[in-house]
Design a protein with these regions (language model features):
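Low-complexity, intrinsically disordered Gly/Pro/Thr-rich segments
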Residues: 71-73, 198-209
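Conserved SAM-binding loop
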Residues: 39-145, 221-224
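Class I SAM-dependent methyltransferase Rossmann-like catalytic core
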Residues: 1-36
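Surface-exposed cleft-lining segments at the edges of enzyme active sites
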Residues: 10-16, 89, 110-119, 176-181
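Core SAM-dependent methyltransferase catalytic element
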Residues: 203-226
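Conserved class I S-adenosyl-L-methionine
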Residues: 135-163
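Short alpha-helix
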Residues: 177-198
Length: 226
């Protein structure tokens, strides 16, 4: 889904903030993984938008990894990848697809809030675990941060979801009013997602990124238990 500038804040200002926060997320990831452990990288939810500095940020900043693959339901620029599978991460994956795309490091940046229902979000996490050899890293904005960086609007996304979606329809933001396009997560929901994964051989933790002293982003980090 391409981001549109509906809100009260300057678009370039927003992109600079997003880039800065993604740089902080990358630092958190680098502190937890062992670089010499990583031979292959899989990006989940690669976007067709690639011109903004914040777009596909992690792909652009893992230059040392030779094998880079992508799974996305968008038609993307494939130059950065060895292999590309056009498919939704909430779909069923065959054994062959898992074998072909399973990677040491799997990253999904700001995608899980766009896959639809809570059940779809669970399915996405399940598939990422299946596709991961060593580490996975999922980032998402925090629903209870006062500004929604999708619509660039303040506060209304913190209301109950039914009310939030009614308001979005009233102001003609119909695309974002559909659950299949935007279903924001908070820390409790992220914890529920993690707890839904029983008997997996991963240690899964939550990290938080802050902006103006408040949690702006939630990071799900998984590491294979040796």
């Amino acid at each position: 889904m391409k981001e549109k500038n509906y809100g009260i804040l300057n678009f370039n200002f927003i992109d600079n903030i997003i880039k800065k926060k993604r740089s902080e997320m990358l630092n958190i990831l680098n502190k937890n993984i062992k670089d010499n452990d990583i031979e292959s990288f899989l990006d989940i939810g690669t976007t067709e938008e690639n011109e903004l500095e914040s777009s596909n940020y992690f792909v652009k900043n893992f230059d040392k990894i030779k094998i880079k693959n992508s799974i996305s339901d968008q038609e993307i620029k494939k130059d950065n990848f060895n292999k590309f599978l056009r498919k939704s991460i909430t779909s069923e994956f065959s054994e062959t697809e898992i074998l072909n795309y399973k990677s040491d490091l799997v990253i999904s940046s700001a995608t899980i809030e766009h896959v639809g229902s809570y059940e779809n979000q669970i399915k996405m996490l399940e598939n990422i675990i299946k596709l991961t050899n060593k580490y996975f890293f999922i980032t998402t904005p925090n629903r209870f941060f006062p500004i929604d960086f999708h619509t660039k609007l303040p506060v209304i996304h913190m209301l109950p979801k039914k009310i939030h979606r009614k308001i979005l329809r009233l102001i003609n933001l119909n695309e974002y009013a559909e659950e299949e396009n935007l279903n924001l997560l908070d820390e409790n929901t992220v914890n529920k997602l993690i707890n839904s994964q029983q008997n997996v051989s991963f240690e899964i933790r939550i990290f938080k990124v802050k902006l103006f002293g408040l949690t702006s982003n939630l990071l799900i980090y998984g590491e294979k238990i040796k």
